[in-house]
Amino acid sequence: MAPAASRLRVESELRSLPKRALAQYLLFLKFYPVVTKAVSSGILSALGNLLAQMIEKKQKKDSRSLEVSGLLRYLVYGLFVTGPLSHYLYLFMEYWVPPEVPWARVKRLLLDRLFFAPTFLLLFFFVMNLLEGKNISVFVAKMRSGFWPALQMNWRMWTPLQFININYVPLQFRVLFANMAALFWYAYLASLGK
């Protein structure tokens, strides 16, 4: 085969890689929705922590290596908490407040912002405290100092994103949409943990 033809074939295969990856993701999403969302959430949560560490390292001009335990904590949190729980919460919301209900968009947003957001944040602080091996007094101290500022930041950042997510993003993609936005949110939360 001529070098030019070989190069064209490789370039064609590389261009089709995103399409194949998307097709594979959609297939997994169809047959294994909870597992697919859990794995996606775990990976993206760990990437959010990696982003936080890189930002902190650059700001402090720190030469230390990355903290692998932080990456693992966020991976575990996304894999076992955020991914599966979000899957079921979005299903619950779809069932409890169907789109045809009057004021459904507003009701869904209020349910998410006033109930789900504080609950998820409380769960985040609790699980991270456990994964860090810290006692309950450390958890209580973090809740006193960090919960309210984090919840206020959550409401500012997530309210427009969640309005779009819960009202316009197809149900099967809501966890992924939230996970993509959460890359930056987890970077913020990781900075609070320091």
Curated annotation (Swiss-Prot):
Q: Name one GO cellular component term.
A: cytoplasm
Q: Which residues lie on this side of the membrane: Cytoplasmic?
A: 2-30, 96-113
- Which of the residues are on side Peroxisomal? 52-74, 135-172
List where the protein spans the membrane.
Answer: 31-51, 75-95, 114-134, 173-193
Q: What membrane topology is annotated for this entry?
A: Multi-pass membrane protein
Q: What does this protein do?
A: Seems to be involved in pore-forming activity and may contribute to the unspecific permeability of the peroxisomal membrane.
Subunit organization: Interacts with PEX19 and SIVA1.
Describe the family membership recorded for this protein in Swiss-Prot or TrEMBL. Belongs to the peroxisomal membrane protein PXMP2/4 family.
Q: What is this protein called?
A: Peroxisomal membrane protein 2
Source organism per entry reads Rattus norvegicus
Q: Which gene encodes it?
A: Pxmp2
